[in-house]
From Swiss-Prot:
Cytoplasmic side, ranges: 121-124
Protein name as catalogued: TM2 domain-containing protein biscotti
Knockout-associated phenotype: Viable but females are sterile. Reduced adult lifespan. No morphological defects of the eye, wing, notum or leg. Eggs produced by mutant mothers fail to hatch and embryos display neural hyperplasia.
Segments crossing the lipid bilayer: 100-120, 125-145
Family recorded in the similarity comment: Belongs to the TM2 family.
Amino acid sequence: MFPVLLLLLFFFAKETHQINVDCNELQMMGQFMCPDPARGQIDPKTQQLAGCTREGRARVWCIAANEINCTETGNATFTREVPCKWTNGYHLDTTLLLSVFLGMFGVDRFYLGYPGIGLLKFCTLGGMFLGQLIDIVLIALQVVGPADGSAYVIPYYGAGIHIVRSDNTTYRLPRDDW
């Protein structure tokens, strides 16, 4: 009987310290997780976040770390805008297959929305097959994408490439060992 009372006392005496914060101010890694994996916010058709806009932003549900309570919702969940890749239905695997097997006729470029280059490849038999080979490499590296500016449909946790670009306005932070 005494061990049962001791166990009940320990169970009810446990204190929880809930911290109420504005969850939109959380910025450090480990304070929250976006998107909340329990909500299933990945669109199965596009393999991107549901509601991804043309500007590359999506509002998703996030979850705060343990013992953090959001003042907006009264629980540990909140919404936040996160970056995403807007897709318009062009699949990378379809484009690669078209480029490998029908690239000499320009079908891959017609599929991506480049009819002029597709017609040029058709008339020159893929640029004497050299243009076809170059297109296969450029499409595999995701340098050539759909003409409407969208991203390829790639599995959400797939081998997507994020290209980091710089121009004359890019500032490179000098390192100590230079």
